[in-house]
A protein has these predicted regions:
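Extracellular/lumenal ectodomain signal focusing on beta-strand-rich modules
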Residues: 16, 108, 183, 241-243
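RNA pseudouridine synthases
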Residues: 1-156, 160-165, 189, 263
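Conserved beta-strand segments that form the floor/walls of ligand-binding pockets within enzyme
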Residues: 18, 104, 145, 185, ...
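Short aromatic-glycine motifs in intrinsically disordered, low-complexity regions
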Residues: 167-176
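Short glycine- and Lys/Arg-enriched binding-loop motifs that mark or flank ligand-binding interfaces
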Residues: 17, 69, 111, 116, ...
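Generic recognition of long tandem-repeat/solenoid scaffolds
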Residues: 68, 157, 171, 194-196
Length: 265
């Protein structure tokens, strides 16, 4: 059975791993004669992948990993809003529409964010990579163009993030939010804008966007936390997953990739 990392995580936290018919912890001791059952059902709609023909920029691939330079605007995953035009469906088409296809992104980028995304080709590889997130063996850095110059020009933003409310997609800085830390460094100043290099220590939704906006320097073109700039950044904003240093989970090879967006030059 092929099971996604998110399905396993959901089953773990929602009591859908059973030992002899009773909810069990993942570290529960199993004895001969015990029956273990697992319900992978997730509390979200299931979308059947459809081929989406898109010329993908793929800087790295082997039998277990696929690294894609995602364009923007493009949804990372299919949804009710984007059932066809998604990276998920583009990868499905690129791989030849294999039967039983399971999409296993290790990191996700917002629709308006471009850059390097890592996709595992099997569940074991995905699990290994998820365990490496935010360690020196899996280092990802971003470039952002901001409205305004962050002060100080280098530092750590350590501010908890929470959903604005149950119905909103916006996030906000709030004391009762999830811990969130972002390292940043201004690498260039261009009039009233700054080119900023960032590294996530945690992985909250919209983390970079919310943290930069909290400094009074939203990402250029960010319609949620700043000002939309449709002529300069149509359908997207100036945020890009630009640098990746990755230890291959199977071969231990060190993979180093760069993707520099045109607006940062």
């Amino acid at each position: 059975m092929s099971v996604s990392y998110s399905a396993m995580k959901s089953a773990k936290w929602n009591g859908r791993i059973l030992l002899n018919g009773e909810p069990a912890f993942v570290d529960t001791l199993v004895r001969a004669g015990d029956t273990v059952s697992f319900d992978p059902a997730e509390n979200r709609p299931v979308y059947t992948p459809v081929p989406f023909p898109l010329a993908l920029n793929i800087p790295w691939e082997d039998e277990s990993l696929l690294i894609v330079d995602k364009p923007a605007p493009l949804a990372s995953q299919s949804s009710a809003a984007h059932p066809d035009d998604s990276l998920e469906n583009a990868v499905y088409a690129y791989l030849g529409c294999p039967p039983g296809f399971v999409y296993r992104p290790v990191n996700r980028l917002d629709r308006g964010t471009s850059g390097l995304m890592i996709i595992a080709k099997d569940g074991h590889t995905q699990d290994l990579l998820q365990r490496m997130l935010h360690t020196e063996d899996f280092r990802r850095e971003y470039l952002a163009l901001t409205e305004g110059i962050p002060f100080p020009r280098e530092g750590l933003i350590d501010r908890p993030i929470a959903k604005e409310n149950a119905a909103s997609v916006r996030r906000e800085i709030r004391p009762d939010g999830q811990p969130a830390q972002t390292e940043y460094r201004v690498v260039d100043v261009r009039g009233g804008r700054a080119l900023v290099r960032l590294r996530l220590r945690t992985g909250r939704t919209h983390q970079i966007r919310v943290h930069l906006a909290s400094l009074g320097c939203p990402v250029c073109g960010d319609f949620l936390y700043g000002t939309e700039l449709p002529e300069e950044f149509p359908g997207r904003f100036a945020l890009h997953s630009a640098f990746l240093t990755q230890v291959h989970p199977h071969t231990q090879e060190k993979i180093q990739l760069e993707s520099i967006p045109s607006w940062s030059r």
